[in-house]
Structure formats: structure tokens, C-alpha cells
Amino acid sequence: MFYNWLKLYKFSKMATLVEIERDFLQKTAQKFAPEVVALITKALDYSKKWHGEQKRLSGEPFFIHPLRTALRLVEWNMDSNTVCAGLLHDIIEDTQVTEADLTAIFGKEITDLVVKVTKITSESKKQRQLNRKKEDLNLKSLVNIAMSSQQEVNALVLKLADRLDNISSIEFLAVEKQKIIAKETLELYAKIAGRIGMYPVKTQLADLSFKVLDPKNFNNTLSKINQQKVFYDNEWGNFKKQLEEMLEQNQIEYRLESRIKGIYSTYQKLTFHEQNIAKIHDLFAIRLIVKSELDCYHLLGLIHLNFTVLMKHFKDYIASPKQNFYQSIHTTVRLKGLNVEIQIRTQRMDHVSKYGFASHWIYKEKKEGLLASALQVNYLNSKQMHSRDFFKRIFGTDIIKVNVSSDNEPNIVKKLNVESNSKLLDIAYELYPKQFNKLEKIKLDGVEVMSFDVTAENEMVIEFCFGKTNNLKRRWLRYMNNHVFRERVKKDLNKLKKAVKYSELPLYEKALEELHLKLADETQIKQRLNALGIKKLTEFLELIEYPHFPKNEHLYFLASNNQKWRELIKPIKFALSQAVFQNSYFEQIEGIYITKIVIETCCTKIPDMPEQVIGILMKNILRVHLHDCRELANQKQPKIIPLYWNAHQLKMRPRKFRCQINIRGVWSETTVNKIVQTIIEGDSYLERIIPKIDKQKDEFELNITMFIDNYHQLITIMEQITTKNISYVWKYL
């Protein structure tokens, strides 16, 4: 009943060397041909001979470590060369055996693997030393390690097996060294495991590290998980029974597995959800492994028709696999007080989810095994796959070059290598952390950008311009991809909670002091805000975060003894309106004063649609509708303003827009699944689908809410649905 984290140890603490060796030989005999087993046994005997009487700090024979490492590799379905290298991976480093000796006995391929793992270990230690005073081992450490291993994914997998065994027996080291290794494991090796798709290994590495680094929160989180497990045990059992009955009634062959979220992952989500474990939608999960992709979608349709589904958590990784080839359908159902995530996948997909990239080779020496897709095998076996391509595929990014200068150092241009997903603000903080809060402008190729929400591009010329006063904006946090920099900016904002607010009066007063000014009294503030149509000071402070005020008009406006404050009304209104439009996706409308644009959800409005989009101006707020929206009938003499999409903003800050459609047509057993699959394959995000099915009349009706890029994408999706031999008509909602 209880979640026993000790199961994360792959081997019993009581298992002896003899028992582990017996288990290892049995499993190799089951998975490999006799001639391959002979090679592995040769490596085992060689490793045992040279490690001899060496002992671990636990008092165990040292040889038990490479043996357990190799056993993990067998269980992870790695090839014989990698298993042999696992047995031999410490030979060169810890004995008198040389690289030449190893090559003469076991050949170049096995020796190269041993050497590469040694290089990864060396690079890891080097990075540990370089980063020992930093808060985080960032992705650049991963770059160096991935590059050092060239295209050998199996070298990384071998290193993960090595590290997993070491972290499992870490208690024999000094406490300080435990923490250093655990920190590196959590921030580096667990990330690598996740990036190459070995999620169970990632969980083990993260949880074992977490227990060392923060035992108090580890135990608290474990206790909360167990409390939830006990509290909802009956509900959990009833739900599984319902699922099994539904599957059997529909004659679907399946295997059902259940899992509870890892402890460290749960702790991270508890931090985000303010310690409310009930808000974690995937704490409990059921995996349903079926025979085919068609069964996956058939089962998805059954679940959505028979249970209450939380569509915002629906994800189809079959139609859109992850970078590491992970495929599965995730959907979440709501029970009585309990959310349960259901993962639907085929047997091959399940194999990939457990072993990641390690599962994608086809080995002739294996007696049996699952075949990877031709695409995966061709990619991984390609002679063209250089280390840079390998890194990009696994880690989802690449390295680009940018040229950076600042107005404080006008004659100095810094050439910088950054990750391709770096934002301009990431680069600004990395180079100018002390001046970052005073950043006023950014220029690209000499032209000032209208929004700081820009991703760096190769060979981009960037200039940062700084002012004299604090210009930090709350929204900047959304414009940064580097989570370490983002956390530091949060600290600068003096807010560690989820909603970081720069709109606090003390910060405004501090900015006034820097200009030798004082805040006006309450009566003066009220009078001046009324002139802007603003009721509260807090509202004003929120609004001034967005615009750029070249002459600090927003500060002088509320300064005491400023008799010319009325002269500032017009430029402030202009700046506020301009900022609102610049942070929207519409062309600026001259001559109107607005403090907010609200895209209403009552009707569909997407870029490039032929229908006219309009704004209704009400109390300085521009509310966006479709020209024939039914809600307009309720408005009394509305001030209607035609709006036009801003192509530049859509290009610079791409996003998806809410689209609501109604589809009606001829129903069949596969209709709903085909439509859902087509929508997701069209690179859209499906939020909600409400089906109405009349089987007697063979009719269906779907109300669908999804997020898409533009009208062209919507039309493409609808045309694709037509190719599925579905008879239907559709309209906007």
C-alpha cells in the first residue's frame, strides 16, 4: 500500500557478490547468443582478476560495482559491447591495464567505449570544479559532456548505470562529498537521463539525490504521497476495476500498470502548487499498453466518453513525439476528489519510454527483441550524425554565435556562443548582471526592438542600452528561458512567490529618490490619477511597468510640488496606449487612450481570418470581438473600432490563439478519434471537446476548443479531416 522509495535501489543491500554474479549470468544467457555470452564472461573474468582485492568504502569487493553496472545495462537491453564495457569501465583508471592492453584483448569498439566513459567522467569532474561556486550546473555542462562522447549514446547510458550504482551506495562517503555528488547527479545526470528518454532512471537518480541533499523535504514529500495513497486507495481500486471492465467489454487486449509520481518530481510540483498536493494532476497514473496505435485512439475515445476528462492536461505524443522519440497519449480523468493520469501506448512505445535512446538499436546477436522504427534506426546509425547533431536531437537545442555590445562599452564587441533557445534577456543578464535592472533598450542590427521577447538568432548583432534608474519589469520573467537567471531576477524583485509584483510602492518611491523627488500627498495623487481615468495608485503602478518613458514622465507625474503635472497627461496616455498595442497583436490605433486590450472568449478571433475583428472601447479598455459576435447585441451604442492584425508582432512573438468550432456529420466508431488525431497532428493544442453522438441516426456533433496559429492552419486541419473520409460541416462558435 505504501510507496516504498527503497525500491529505487535496483539491488538488495543484502545481495552478495555471488548472488549478483549468478543473476547477471542467467540474464545474459537469456538475452544473448552463446558466442556473445562467452565474450561477456571473458570480460567478467578479466575485470574480476584485475580489480582483485580492491575494496569499496562499504567494505564490499570493488568488483561488485562494475558487475552491478553491467547487470543494469543487460536489464536496459544494451548491446554486448556496452555490457562488456560496463564490466571494464574502471579498469584503465584504477588498475595497471592500459588502453593498448584492452584493445589487444577485447578489440577497438569495446575499448573506445571504456575510454569515452573515462572522458565523460573526467569532463564531469572538470565541470564540477568549475561550477562549485555557482548555483546551478546549467545546460552548457551538458553540452561539454555530450560533445566529449561524440555520437555514442551508449557511452552516456553506460555512465548513467555507473552513476546510479554509485549514488545508491553513497552513504559510505563523507557527508560533504555526498552532497557534492548528489548535487551533480541531480543537476546533470538526472537531466541527461531525461533528455535521452530513460525516465525511470531519471526518477531513481533524482530521488536518491534528493534524499541526500534535503532529507527533511524528502521525508515530508514521501509522507504526503503515502497519505494520498491511503486516503484514495478505495477510489483507486474502483477506478482500475471500471477501466478493466470497459476494456474487456470492448474486447481490447491490454496490459495495465500503475505508478506513483517520483518523490523529487512531486516535491517540485508541490513548490509550484503552494504545497497543495491535490492540485498535482499526475500524482497517480495508470499505463495501458495495447497492441496497436489504432487501439490507442480507440481506447482514448472510450475513456473520453465514459469519464470526466480534464482536457487542459491532454497531450498526444504519438502524433507529435518528443525529441527523444517518446510516444504516448496522456489524458487525465477526474474522480471523486482525485485526478488520475492515464497513459496509453503500444508495447514498443512502452519499451522506448523506459529505455529511451538505448532501445533504438537492432542487434543481430539478440535472440529476440523489439524492433525500432526505420526512422530511428537510420538516424542513430547514420554516419552523418556528428556530435553537434546528436546534441541538438537529444537536448533540443543548438549552439549559435552572437555579437554583443552595450552603450556603456561602445567600442567593445563581445563574440558569444549561446544556446539557440536563448532570449535576449538571458544574454543581457549573463553579460551584465549588475546593470540588468536598468536595461532600457535593445537594438538588433542598429534598430530598436519594440518588445524584449525575442529569441537570439545566429550571427545576430545585439546592443544593450542602460539607463540610470531601475527599469525592471515583471513581464521580463516571461521573456527569459534560463531558469537560474529568472530566479535571480525574482530575488531582485523581492518576491519569491509565484506572482512576482514590481508594483509595490516602496520601489516606486525608491525610483523617485534616485531623481531627488518625493511622492505627492494622497489628495494630489487622487486628483492626478482621475485625470488619467485611473482610480487606484496600485492600478497606476501596474500600468507603468509596460511603457518606456524616455524622460521619466511616470515619476514626475506623481512627484510633490510639480505644478506642471497636467503637461504630462498627454505623453503618459500616449505611452500607455502605445505600450498596450505593442504588447498586443494588433496595429496601433491613433487618437484613442486605452490601458488594456481584452480578447473576449465569446467568439473566435484568429490571425488572417477573412472576417473583420473589431474592438469595443469601454472605460479605457478595448474589448475584442468578431464583427458579428452575438454579444454585440447586448451593447448600447458601443464605440466600435476596426482592428487589424500586426504581422510583425505575430512573427516576433508567435503564439497560439483560441479557436472554437462546431463540427456536425455522419458518425462512425472511428470518427471522433480521426478528428482528434488530425487536429493534434496539425500542430494545434486541443483544450476541450464536447461530443454529442446519436447512434440511431448515425450523427455526431462536436464542440471543439483548440489553440492554433492562424486561419491558414485551421483551414489546413479541416482539409485534412476531409481526407479521412468523414462527411461533415463546420462553423465558428
Swiss-Prot record:
Top-rank EC class of the record's enzyme: hydrolase
InterPro entries: HD/PDEase_dom, HD_domain, NT_sf, RelA/Spo_fam, RelA_SpoT
GO terms under cellular component: plasma membrane
Signal peptide from the UniProt entry: none
Domain of life (superkingdom): Bacteria
Pathway as given in its UniProt record: Purine metabolism; ppGpp biosynthesis; ppGpp from GDP: step 1/1
Protein name as catalogued: Probable guanosine-3',5'-bis(diphosphate) 3'-pyrophosphohydrolase
Organism expressing this protein natively: Mycoplasma pneumoniae (strain ATCC 29342 / M129 / Subtype 1)
Encoding gene per record: spoT
